Amino acid sequence: MSASSLLEQRPKGQANKVQNGAVTQKDTLNDDEFEPYLNAQPRQSNAYTAMSDSYMPSYYSPSIGFTYSLNEAAWSTGGDPPMPYLASYGQLSNGEHHFLPDAMFGQSGALGNNPFLGQHGFNFFPSGIDFPAWGNSSSQGQSTQSSGYSSSYAYAPSTLGGAMIDGQSPFAANEPLNKAVGMNSLDQGMAGLKIGAGDMAPKVVGSGLPGGPLSQVSTAPTMPPASMAPAKTASWADIASKPAKPQPKLKTKGGLGGTNLPPPPIKHNMDIGTWDNKGNMPKPAAPQQTSLPTNGQPPNQSSPQPGATAGGVPQLPLSNGQLVPPTGQLVQHPLPPGGQPGAVPPQLSQGPPASQPSQPTRWVPPRNRANGFGDAAGGPGQSPPNSGMGGITVPAEPHPVLEKLRMVNNYNPKDFDWNPKHGRVFIIKSYSEDDIHRSIKYNIWCSTEHGNKRLDAAYRSLANKGPLYLLFSVNGSGHFCGVAEMRSPVDYNTCAGVWSQDKWKGRFDVRWIFVKDVPNSQLRHIRLENNENKPVTNSRDTQEVPLDKARQVLKIIASYKHTTSIFDDFSHYEKRQEEEESVKKVEVQGSDPYSNNSSRSHYRMQDRQGRVK
């Protein structure tokens, strides 16, 4: 083995005795001559300097080796003041820079008194080794005390053989070289939040280092980073996921307990858009705390068509069969001094709004009859008491006109013959329920000019051989309101003068048999072959129904157990008729009935509400 090959295998940093020249034959040595140097002095420093220089021994690294292995050294806890940042540059035995106190000025030349070996710089004395103490204090307290200076002047532990200068805690023995300066302090702090101080003890420098020469110790810490990196990454992921875990628990407790803030919005959102919500009911009900005056008033305030009450809040029938005026008819009336708007919401909240979802698209009767326009209609037993209705004028007894009509006529008979052998049946479409009320009251009817001719011809054709039944329905109401029998031919020269519109001419007598509200859903399955096979509910005025289909319709109407009828609103329509008559008296005195804008809008509103939507 040549000397040049031996020089290449020497540890890094050892000086070559033959510099700047070729190796001659006389300089060649045997292998066994280097054994004492390679085996006996592995720990000595290789930086030899001339002893004649009084400054060099103390200024640079000491020329003597350490007398103990570095794996016995305690990791500095930073108990000493962070002095190394005031030191000047020097070099350790492995060739890396470090900071040491300047021994040139104000320091003794003896190496025994040099801070390099006095525990101030390295704390190399094995006495007081306490690894668990490092885990408790370094990760939580000491890293914050010395990180102000030590993190800026510390170097990788691989360059110091696993030792730390002046208790600088930011670097561990397994610190990767590519990690930013000071990141170890952050890792230790975050890891301490997760696994505590007891699990940090295995990361102490001395635990994973072999007890060998300095050159071997310096390479040992380079292996653990590969295995320790996943553990740190896992701790970061666990810590990041911790804040998200309590969130579902808080929501669950809030929904079950009902005492936190989330339940009120949930309860509020459940009420919004549902028909059981009574929060919006008092708004239209407040102005109805008054009775209708009987003196003359503008028609636009008092007598709109029944369709004008679609937006109003219907009321349930009272126990005595009478109903209070609907809200849609009394919105413009002033509130009397004795009215109590606050008493209305409890009464309105008791009504079951069964069919309200479909009301905005069709005509709605003015009272609580709207609750019965469905297959699952509520019974009259659901009507609220009238004790809390405030200033509403409620008749104590049924209307006298209605009582007289019921005594004279046997409405809704149980022994009705719905299967006549001969007869004819026609559909009657009314523009308003006001006209239905007056037809029941006066037992008369009048259709259009074309309708009168058709009905008159049909009546005469029967020649009393069979009945002629009329199935009444208000345009857009969604139900049939009754059945009447035509009892006389049409008198074209007579004008009744009782209809809500004065454009009707002619009159014929009728007798009302059934007065009940039957929903279209009960009759929609019956189709008419003489009307393009359309349902009987989709018919025009004076549309004739074939006798076989008419028997089905009459049977359903006769057997249907109704819950509402126009009788529930009879008092209401009586008041409307009185108001219209008072308006007509003013017109007779010489004023143009259409000169007043309010009167004109009133009649237009009636026409609009009477049309089929």
UniProtKB/Swiss-Prot annotation:
One of its GO terms (biological process) is oocyte maturation. Disruption phenotype: Homozygous mutants from the first generation do not show any visible phenotype. Crossing homozygotes mutants together leads to lethality in around 70% of their progeny, because embryos do not developed past the one-cell stage. This lethality is probably mediated by defective sperm males. Defects are due to impaired decay of N6-methyladenosine (m6A)-modified maternal mRNAs, leading to impede zygotic genome activation. Embryos fail to initiate timely maternal-to-zygotic, undergo cell-cycle pause and remain developmentally delayed. GO terms for cellular component: cytoplasm; cytoplasmic stress granule; cytosol; nucleus; P-body. Residues 2-397 are annotated as: Localization to mRNA processing bodies (P-bodies). Residues 423-557 form the YTH domain. It is found in: Cytoplasm, Cytosol; Cytoplasm, P-body; Cytoplasm, Stress granule; Nucleus. This is YTH domain-containing family protein 2. It comes from Danio rerio. The lineage of its organism: Eukaryota, Metazoa, Chordata, Craniata, Vertebrata. The gene is ythdf2.
